[in-house]
Amino acid sequence: MDKLELTIDGYKCFERKSEFNLNNITLFTGANSAGKSSVVQSLLLAKITSETIVEDVDLGIVPISLMNKKYSMELGNYDDIINRQTKTGDIDFSLSGIDYYIKGEKNDDVAKNTVVFSITPEMKNKLKNLFSNGFTYLCAERMAPHYEYQESEFNDICDCHGSNVGDVFSRYLGDDIIGSRSLNFTKGTKLLMQLDEWCNYIFPGIAVRVEKTGSQMYKLKMRNDVAPNVGFGITYALPILVSGLTIPEGGMLIVENPEAHLHAKAQSNMGYFLARMAAAGVRVIIETHSEHIVNGIRRMIVEGKTEMSHEDMTIYFFQNKNGEKDIIEITMDEFGNLSDFPEDFFDQIRQDTLAIIRTNRDRKEQENEKR
């Protein structure tokens, strides 16, 4: 799978042009409020633009609402997304050579929370085609445990909160998944069977069932227990598993905080799962604060059970340094070694351990001085 080159200029914290190469699997990690979510939002704006474009739009002028419920985006208005230091007042994006941008001049003909994207007719068709193989975005605020799920208008894919996962699962449970997404073939390749296998891999002893209780209602069951007996971790993870197993080859899966409510081993195994989906031809993009997610991905690639190469993973580490945004691209070699370990890149355990050692050493020295 070829990399997608994303460039951002003038959007939020991106005062100057910044480039990102979206690999088979790409991870955004690092400090809070350093730009990770803004990169994801740039992709969502591209997707929304591709959905809004229609053939009779003249001159490629596309009004886009910055308050988008489908993708759980509440960006405010133009003044909230423009970088105040940009000289032109424009916000420029490019995705795989497809340029789409927001002009800086005020337009009184559009609503307060709406901006106007400009894109040429040729580029608008390319943008449509770019997302034609499937697109799923799972935001950090996924569903909480509850008994039943209501059928959604977007019932062929999980919505951004995963609230319709029961319906999506029910729709595809008898379908075959792509073989390389199977954990193993002992139970066959049907979605229901493979979801059982992956659930048991991440949450030993857990199996998932969906029971239809009405024309638009489904009840989620885990083994023989009704859904509220299931913890947050499984509930948060289920939309990721179903989406990964059902999205078409060549599609894009964006997941925020896949580690939410999972213990360390489950986080690592979730990373392993996402890497397996990437190896099967899904472009996976992850925003995470978990070193266990990263290490699970590294483990899957190094094991060599798929054709996925170490060159198919890229990590972007975001930090605020001396009041400025700093982004470091980190790659991996064939042995799983990372190209860079900047300060604060998953080294908090080491920092805390050293702090404890120093504190205890100083305490002993003080006690000895008192004797």
Over which residues does each language-model region extend?
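Pre-Walker A-like glycine/lysine-rich segment at the N-terminus of P-loop NTPase domains
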Residues: 1-49
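C-terminal lobe/lid and adjacent interdomain/linker elements of RecA-like ASCE P-loop ATPase modules
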Residues: 2, 269-371
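Phosphate-coordinating catalytic segments in nucleotide- and nucleic-acid-processing enzymes
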Residues: 5-7, 49-243, 248-249, 321, ...
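Short, solvent-exposed loop/turn segments at secondary-structure junctions
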Residues: 11-13, 27, 33-34, 142-145, ...
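Phosphate-binding P-loop
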Residues: 17-23, 245-249, 276-278
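Walker B catalytic motif
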Residues: 255-258
